[in-house]
């Protein structure tokens, strides 16, 4: 490297053409330890013990819990409770994620979807997620799935979550949800949200048909008492489609319904 001047080496290093650690040799190159009193960077009274070295933010572990919906639901003279939320623990790039959604009434769980996932950041706004999903329905057989999906913030501030599932017996499923915050004031905002579910084959034991199975669209008016505590009221339209709607009709259940909701969102 004696043929390279320091300026040439700096240009090559900046451009990524000079390997790290290779330095240009010059007759006037200064010894980096010339004025250190005989000490190097790894010794002396101000040297840090490796156990106490400075840790950057991406090396720390964090945790968060967020309950997006904890609400009272009323439709056609019936009432029940509903929840949807997620928690995570890990670093900036890799974390353990728990997702949950379900309905309950009279102190008993009626149905739930729980996911245990490993999340990995692939960009500043997107995570990939890999893990397992567990479905529970009262009086129905439980289902277990492998899950792979993406979750993140799309352009124009749309929050998206799309996950594909593979279950036993050749079962497949796809779930997609989206929501958006439309600010009315600094604290008051409307939140439209939607969710759809697709299944690859019929599952008559759980009253699920092949294809587009069910979906819902909701609109909630939220008020931020604080950033961490947000009460709301809203309305939601839920519908079943295709073979799932036929199964609901045969069982005497509603294929479509309008739901009125009131609840809170909170996180810490």
What residue spans do the PLM features occupy?
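Repeated loop/turn-to-beta-strand initiation elements of outer-membrane beta-barrel proteins
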Residues: 93-98, 124-128, 156-160, 185-190, ...
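Outer-membrane beta-barrel "beta-signal"
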Residues: 219-224, 255-268
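Residues that define the transmembrane beta-barrel architecture of outer-membrane proteins
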Residues: 61-63, 79-83, 110-114, 142-146, ...
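Membrane-embedded beta-strands of outer-membrane beta-barrel proteins
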Residues: 85, 116, 148, 176-178, ...
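Residue-level signature of outer-membrane beta-barrel architecture
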Residues: 89-91, 120, 152, 166, ...
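Transmembrane beta-barrel strands of outer-membrane/channel proteins
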Residues: 69, 98-102, 130-134, 162-166, ...
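Detector for outer-membrane/organellar transmembrane beta-barrel domains
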Residues: 141-204
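Outer-membrane beta-barrel initiation region
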Residues: 25-107, 120
